[in-house]
Design a protein with these regions (language model features):
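ATP-binding pocket architecture of kinase catalytic cores
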Residues: 74-173
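ATP-binding glycine-rich phosphate-binding loop
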Residues: 50-72
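ATP/Mg2+ or Mg2+-diphosphate-binding catalytic cores
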Residues: 321-370
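Juxta-kinase regulatory segment immediately upstream of eukaryotic protein kinase catalytic domains
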Residues: 2-12, 17-54
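Active-site acidic catalytic loop and adjacent metal/ATP-binding pocket
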Residues: 65-76, 80-81, 114-116, 215-272, ...
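A glycine-centered beta->alpha junction motif in the catalytic cores
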Residues: 86, 120, 131-148, 189-198, ...
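A cross-family kinase active-site recognition segment
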Residues: 146-204, 228, 336-338
Length: 370
């Protein structure tokens, strides 16, 4: 019931159903997307305008939400240039993300923070083929993913995230979102239903199951008086860069945060539960190790453990809406060919039914924390 695949929120349910996507209308998209304008020369020109002169070598990195490039510079250095998805965030929201990163860096919490550009700002603007873009540049950092099967690694991550939260609780975001049942559950559900892309044969079962699951999410959030704080928001292992001493170039070794694009206000447990996988017994041991480290730097409210499965449920629903809303981006259909198929929605219904069962079971038992 607590398999690692549920954290991923979407797997290929039935490749044979890919043809059904045409019947949903989900594969229709404009002939041009704003990111289509980001030619190599356009990327280099935009960076050049900020004072970062590329030598002509660049490599597009793996990112679906934004477009990210490693760019070699004339001075022998390298940066990672991030072009934000047009229309997703405002300047104020991005600057809150950058400000949070700067606060973390000032508190010596390892984070790959955006560079201050030639005009003294971390956020730049470029007009490319009539399309406005927001962009930022980051130092290039190497490393690898954390070894989550090691208790010492989990304890280290607990200490690291507690330090991040100690900074996060000092003030609130004003412009960025709050992770709650409305923003990440009910609103995505409404958008999916309005999009009219779920095949009729799967619609009633999925909608009914989703509504039942959200009723349990609502009840869980009402029962746990969690104090929201600034979070990483998407703290899965892929967003944690583990750096060894030989790789640090003067930085600290251990975990580094590399992406605050999804930073939100929310409960502390949101930045912890995605480190867990396996059976309930396995997750209990993993969370015990994480919290042994976490509580060295910050108090943890054990009642938030009851939000793990509700938060997993919100992530599943939000992920489906995210795919639907990004389908006009040419990068998405080849990467997620199963999305929108009858098999996909059937699998989502089954996974939501599993979540209903999981939310009805007792939360992780870590009574020793009281």
């Amino acid at each position: 019931m607590h398999s690692p695949s549920r954290a991923a929120c979407a797997t290929d349910p039935a490749a044979a159903d890919s043809a059904a996507l045409a019947d949903t209308g989900a594969n229709t998209r404009p002939s041009a997307h704003p990111f289509d304008h980001l030619s190599p020369q356009a990327v280099l020109d935009a960076l050049d305008a900020t004072g970062l002169r590329g030598d002509g070598r660049l490599l597009q990195l793996n990112s679906y939400e934004n477009r990210v490039f490693q760019v070699m510079l004339e001075d022998g250095g390298a940066v990672v240039a991030k072009f934000y998805r047009p229309g997703r965030w405002s300047d104020a929201q991005i600057l809150e993300e950058h400000g949070f990163a700067a606060e973390l860096a000032a508190a010596e919490v390892p984070v790959v923070a955006p560079l201050v550009l030639g005009d003294g700002q971390t956020l730049a603007h470029a007009l490319i083929a009539g399309q406005p873009f927001r962009l930022a540049a980051y130092p290039r950092r190497s490393g690898h993913g954390p070894e989550l099967d090691q208790p010492d690694t989990l304890r280290w991550l607990g200490r690291f995230i507690a330090r991040l939260h100690a900074v996060g609780e000092q003030r609130a975001f004003v412009h960025r979102r709050t992770l709650d049942a409305q923003t990440f559950g009910h609103a995505p559900l409404a958008r999916l239903l309005d999009a009219d892309l779920i095949p009729p044969a799967q619609l009633d079962a999925w909608r009914s199951t989703c509504q039942q699951a959200l009723a349990l999410v609502d009840a869980a959030f009402a029962a746990v008086p969690a104090q929201p704080l600034r979070l990483h928001g998407d703290c899965h292992p892929g967003n944690i860069l583990w750096r060894e001493l030989v790789e640090t170039q003067g930085d600290s070794s251990g975990p580094h945060i590399v992406d605050l694009d999804d930073a939100v206000m929310g409960p502390a447990i949101q930045d912890l539960w995605m480190l867990l996988s396996g059976s309930p017994d396995a997750m209990r041991g993993q969370m015990a190790a994480v919290l042994q480290g976490y509580r060295q730097f910050r108090r943890f409210d054990v009642r938030e453990l009851a939000l793990i499965e509700p938060l997993r449920t919100l992530r599943m629903i939000h992920h489906s809406a995210w795919l639907a809303e990004r389908w006009s981006d040419p990068a998405f259909p080849p990467a997620f060919p199963w999305f929108g198929t009858a098999g996909y929605w059937g699998q989502q219904t089954m996974q939501l039914q599993e979540q209903i069962e999981a939310m009805g079971a007792p939360p992780l038992d870590l009574d020793w924390l009281d």
